[in-house]
Amino acid sequence: MANLLENFAAHHSMTAGAKKKADHQDTSVSQDSGYSDSLKGFSPDSHKSGNFLETVTEGYENSENIDPTLILSPIKYELSWGADTRESKQLAPLYETPRVGKKEFSLRRRLLISKATSGGNLDFDVSVCSAESCGREKSLRRIPSHEGSLSNSFADSPRDGSYEPIATSTLKTESESGTSCKKWRLSFAQQRSSTLDDSKSDSIPLPEVENISPVQHSLASSTDDSILYEETIFGAPTTPTCNFIVKEEFQTPISNLAANFRFNLCTPDVGHVSDFDISVTEDSAFHSLSLDKSQDSITDHEGSFQELIQKPRETSKAVNNKSRLRKLDRCRRLSTLRERGSQSEVEEEGNEVPVLSSAYKLKVARASVDEENEFSSDESRVHSLLSSDDLTGKPALRVLHEMLLRSTRKRPQQATVQDLLGSSGCFELPEDSLSRLIGRKMGLETFDILAELKNRNLKHILASILDLVNAASICSMCRVSRDWRDVVLQDKSAHQRRKAYIKKLKTEAEQGRQLSFEDSATRLNILSRSALRSVQIQARSAFRTPTSSLTPGDNKSIHSASKHQEYLKVAKTLFTDEALKPCPRCQYPAKYQALKKRGTCSRKDCGFDFCSLCLCTFHGSKECGTGSAKRIPKKEALPGSAQSKRNLKRL
């Protein structure tokens, strides 16, 4: 019975140490800035340890009713001890932290739990987090805590006794490590490993399963040999914390994590970088982020690194499609700019450079082969349509080709067809072929139809045109240009008509010069007025101005200059409200105003100011009087006048 009580007391001391360790674990994790206190209540670890302690305390309370001297009945002791040994025997050969199927914990929490149980130099402030844990501590205070047995049980573990913590929550360790707490949390989120440290011991941990972590380790490291060595060891007991923490199949030694932590952050693996779209960086609008910014963005992610990497891998196809579309748009913009600017400048120098450069073709070939085929097909189509072999007898297409070249070379577009065909060195076009070109004179302000017909040697069309024109128009055509004169001279009938008309003009001019009358000089230019010529001459000679005492100069003969020319001279000096009217005294042109009813003779010798109604001296606003300056009646009436007609009727 005494031996049974001693064994049971030792067992309860181990459970008390385990409870104390679990409280250390909860308080230390709750003090970390990266984890919230709400996780502790929902963690399966706390529920599992709580259930185990509840079974012990319930058994203790039931045992008080049976016997106050006995802590636990032998039956319950044997049952609980047997269950504990069976569980430890099942988990002993694995040498790794068991895993719970509900939720996995981060590496930092597992490291802190292992360091708290191993008695390292980490300082944790133990605080009671819940009323339930306080009640459990009070119920177990009567049992003497046996910390020595707990430390002795850990001494049999395959790990070395000396531990060096990777990261703590104190400021001192953060300054020594040179990195912030967020970066350590990043490394713990990226690494998924157990708490075995193999850097100093000869014993090797279990072999690793398939590598799920993105942080790659070298296969030739010393840890691989140690893993094979420790695979054969199955007899050493495991740590007591193996029953309370999560299980994990994948393990990464702490030495590799501490040694390769900086290297894995600064130099990512090539395989993962290749999964991303490297072609996005070729865009001018893309700017690559620095490593510090990428690290800071990753540290905000509290999940595993596999979830962080899996998203870009899933969307890699969408990113490739977007980048390809962006490349195509950029290629089209470059081709448009090249066609508008650089292509015209290069072609103006005389060098036939293709539209697409070699560098541009290589860039388009990477993005899409269709883009290059489109531009090459357009270029070959233009060269095939406008080659010199196909345009031998087609002057219109040659002119079009030269106009296109001039528009691209920024040359003046206002040029004739001869200039366009003469500037193109590859075409040698004779001048006769231009005569058959339809529409080459379109757009010109003036166009010589007769000259074009003469150049085309269309004499029958010219003959039909000249037959419709009278002799006077033919004479006028000869005075227009040499081409029209040649057209008239080449046509026999038009030329004979022209000669006959010139002879007639000469004879009429000779007959007109023989007349010696004064007024006949003004009518010599009009050769067709021969009907009443003699009558008009007689009338002018018989007409005499009235003799009166007012104007002594009226008796003088009229100046030999033509009155018609005098009228023209005075008419040039008229205002808009003035008109011409013959003076009642000298019959010279006089200016009169219809509104004022007043007229003034334009001749300096006369200068008569008269009224346009009564033809006497201007009297202003007064009514016209009877004593007006009327013309004296003539003895002989003029032929053809009203008086002469009345005389004839009377006779």
Curated annotation (Swiss-Prot):
Gene3D superfamilies found in the cross-reference section: 1.20.1280.50, 2.20.25.20
Pathway membership: Protein modification; protein ubiquitination
Domain (F-box) ranges: 424-499
GO-annotated molecular function: zinc ion binding
UniProt: Zn(2+) 2 binding residues: 611, 614, 619, 624
Gene Ontology CC terms: nucleus
InterPro entries according to UniProt: FBX5_43, IBR_dom, ZF_ZBR
Keywords: Meiosis, Metal-binding, Phosphoprotein, Ubl conjugation, Ubl conjugation pathway, Zinc, Zinc-finger
Zinc finger (ZBR-type): 579-627
Domain of life: Eukaryota
Post-translational modifications reported in the UniProt record: Phosphorylated on Thr-195 by CaMK2 in response to calcium during egg activation, which promotes subsequent phosphorylation by PLK1, ubiquitination and protesomal degradation. Ubiquitinated by FBXW1 during egg activation, which promotes proteasomal degradation.
Residue segments, region Disordered: 14-42, 140-171
Protein name: F-box only protein 43
Native species: Xenopus laevis
